[in-house]
Amino acid sequence: MSNTMRCILIVCVALTLIAAGCNVEASNSRPPRKNDVNTMADAYKFLQDLDTYYGDRARVRFGKRGGPLMEMLRNRELENNMAKSINSGGELIRALDEEEVF
């Protein structure tokens, strides 16, 4: 493939990707806020539009609420910290030989 054909192909692919991105953003635009919601059907339609718009933008936030797994991990961490503080509470854990002293 020649250099000019390669450049033309790269430009075409770039333009296609840009056009596809613009098309997706335009189709997912927020529904306009209507102050003329008079009936229950209009309000229901507006809420459905908002739900479809924000439905794909909402993210699940893991770890925000404490569950059984988080409680178990927290308890285990507390137990580990307590065991460390008991072992290092000013007592010698092992005796040093005279050869080990610098």
UniProtKB/Swiss-Prot annotation:
One of its GO terms (cellular component) is extracellular region. Residues 1-29 form the signal peptide. GO terms for molecular function: neuropeptide hormone activity. GO terms for biological process: digestion; larval feeding behavior; larval foraging behavior; neuropeptide signaling pathway; regulation of response to food; social behavior. The modification Phenylalanine amide is found at F62. It is found in: Secreted. Residues 30-32, 66-102 form a propeptide. The keyword Glycoprotein does not apply. Keywords: Amidation, Cleavage on pair of basic residues, Digestion, Hormone, Neuropeptide, Secreted, Signal. It comes from the Eukaryota. The keyword Secreted applies. An integral part of the sensory system that mediates food signaling, providing the neural basis for the regulation of food response; coordinates larval foraging and social behavior changes during development. May have a hormonal role in females. Belongs to the NPY family. This is Neuropeptide F. The lineage of its organism: Eukaryota, Metazoa, Ecdysozoa, Arthropoda, Hexapoda.
